[in-house]
Amino acid sequence: MARLVLCALALLVAGGLADPVRNNVPQKPADPVFAKRQMDLMTLFFHVLEPNYIEANKVIVNTWSLEKNIEHFSNVTAVTTYIKMLENQCCVPRAVPFSILEDEHKFEVVTLFNVLHSAKDYDTFYKTAVYVRDRVNPDLFSYVLSAVIVNRPDTKGIYIPRVFEIFPSYFNNGEIMTTAARINTHGDRLVDFYPSTYKWDKNVVIRWNPHLALLQQPEHTYSLLHSRLQPQLILLQRSLSLPGWLQTEALPVNQHRRGEWFWFLHKQLIARYYMERLSNGLGEIPELGHETVKDGTTRSFGTTMEFSSPVRPNNFNLDQPEFVNEVEQIYDYERRVRDAIDQGYVLNHLGERIDISAPEAIEILGRVIEANVDSPNVQYYKDFISVWKKVLGNSLVHEHQYFHHYIPLVVPSVLEHYQTALRDPAFYMIWKRVLGLFQQWQEKLPHYKPEELAMPQVAIEKVDVDKLVTYFEYSYMNVTSGLPMNVEEAKELYDQVSVLVQHPRLNHKKFQVRVNVKTEVAKTVLVKFFLAPKYDSHGHEIPLHVNSYNFMQLDEFVYDLPQGESVITRDSVETTGNEWTTSYQVWDQAEKASREKHLSAKNMYFQDVLIYHKHTLNPCSHVE
């Protein structure tokens, strides 16, 4: 068992990544108008593979016209473009998988986002969303609508159903989804017939049963930790609040330091993963070379279109004829970034030099490596990370294409979906390599001076941490929205059978951190807790200057230190936040708020986005 070190650091309230954190997110009054918007938008996500069943929405679908309402949009170009795309049927078909990494798919994403985001009022936005829901690819629609809700001021605070509630097939194997389909057909009358199901209150529960393929590879002894929902969903949330294809000017809510957050989030993920590997005896994260990838993955899933996602065998050979161009692209694009780091500057699209030799330049470097639209030169510093994902996902071959061979048919791998990428060990191999670029840049920065780090009036005397006790417990995922409604259900707009899937999750008992501090004068400080391994996989102590990149930030909070001796206490429940709210709970709350003005609804979705680097990346987080 690897030993971990907990560090406490007291700093003045300034700098770093402190400002996006919100320990106490203010409540948004849930007036009837807001509550109705919440309910209306939630209905667009539920049973998204099926047509609109709500009568009012049917009227909109049949009568609303983009052409006749074009004056209600600020981005007329996007609207006219999308009208032509719909007329000429050059959108991603509803019956094929969607991949945000495909340029043709991404073009429709950006166009539809600009249409919905540029609606001048909420009514136009909502009617347009209803209108396109039944006309476009459901995965694409759900992704775009989520991104718009996050970034429109008049939908701020709207809760977005979790992706596992919308598309449960991404998170459950074929056996589970087949059993769920049988329950959906037979109701609860055959529960006793299936050994994997039982009745719980008004729900039918499917017992957890991992696919036997997970036992075929040593890496999959870690399957429970790879499959944890929360980090996967946070990666998706980041892509919605700060999508790489959306310029900062169009982000009224989430436009702070996207390049730096890009680095920070993935550094947290890799640091956490490394500690979990050490704790489970899996050793170092393998290096990603240019010949063979030892660890394969059998983590396929049934897509919403009943395609099975590609898998990667063990000892996957990159030296294959079909990968030659892609591998050359990867090394060429990586070399351009390495050259820029060595030279101390990047070139913008005009050929002008932009200095990256200062610590603040991590924002520029992050944008360059992500190759997002705010990069100084996206035509030169290209997206090699996505190419890695396509190659290692083993999903490069497009056998059929649509709309005169313009739109490719690609069945994305686990790596190519934000909500599933962390299940593949190749994700961490890619990001170990990418973080090496950031580390190469950081090593060229000037060293901190003692006066920049020291707080001579504050001394940390001692840090005590309670014993950490972990255990597994079950959580329950509602998959009902992914099951088709029968005629009566569609008429009544109510699911007669609620199907839950049992999943194990790692939890821990409550513990406390105590920091004994001596202060010469009263001072307000920012306290940060970090967790890091003390020994590597060979049992050797890791030198601090080498280990710094393995430090994972657990928590940060503002604290008023009194003069003299004091003890800062922090409970684990303060670090991790509350249980995620389910869509059922939000719907019930919104329904009540639509009738009673005195109720209030928390700004739930934005709370998740703004504090994700605290609780979601904790390797022992009790939230799942």
Curated annotation (Swiss-Prot):
GO cellular component, as recorded: extracellular region
Question: Which sites carry carbohydrate?
Answer: 75, 478
Can the keyword Repeat be found in this entry's annotation? Answer: no
The record's section on InterPro entries has:
Di-copper_centre_dom_sf (IPR008922), Hemocyanin/hexamerin (IPR013788), Hemocyanin/hexamerin_mid_dom (IPR000896), Hemocyanin_C (IPR005203), Hemocyanin_C_sf (IPR037020), Hemocyanin_N (IPR005204), Hemocyanin_N_sf (IPR036697), Ig_E-set (IPR014756)
Going by the UniProt record, its keywords in alphabetical order are:
Glycoprotein, Secreted, Signal, Storage protein
- Keyword Translocase in record: no
The molecular function terms of the Gene Ontology recorded here are: nutrient reservoir activity
Tell me where the signal peptide lies.
1-18
On induction, the UniProt comment says: Suppressed by juvenile hormone.
Where, per UniProt, does this protein localize? Answer: Secreted, Extracellular space
Family of this protein? Belongs to the hemocyanin family.
Question: What name is this protein filed under?
Answer: Acidic juvenile hormone-suppressible protein 1
